[in-house]
């Protein structure tokens, strides 16, 4: 992510701004919504189905719409989507028609990461979830109170994410759609690499 885009995303992820997350029940979108709410933003979101994830968000005071409808984005200053949500989604189409900026999930995480003194990203073809879980265990044992986003369930957390108050953030960094190229880690760990990731890194 270039500096110009980084600054644009940062401007919209400021306290008091209204942000709408399309696909908010996803494994990396749910903690994103909680982190943004903790930063002082007004967060809403939508997902195709009701789930434990959406119920948790509602319990935390986040308004969640079930189903994707154009009117769900009303009042939003910006919209954030997962890589799996395409331009033909009615909320994305409505945002673009209204001139509301649409950012990718990874771009939002990249900006948030810059607010932490210690940012750790774990990537690779295999072993990301296991390695991220191991790092989380170590940081929790060291009482670093980290913010964590894992692409799986960690019994220690009773979830796949954690919103902490420490100066450390740990993200399992997915290579899908080159998402991890939007991050700004202090430490980057690559586990097993296969051809697809090597191509991404070389280009």
Language model feature labels by segment:
Residues 1-52, 58-63, 75, 79, ...:
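ATP-dependent carboxylate-amine ligase
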Residues 6, 17-25, 50, 66, ...:
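Preference for short coil/turn "hinge" residues that link or interrupt alpha-helices
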Residues 10-12, 32-38, 58, 72, ...:
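Phosphate-binding loop of NTP-binding sites
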Residues 48, 68-69, 83:
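Residue immediately C-terminal to the conserved phosphorylatable aspartate in receiver
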Residues 64-68, 103:
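Short acidic-hydrophobic, aromatic-tinged amphipathic segments that line or gate anion-handling sites
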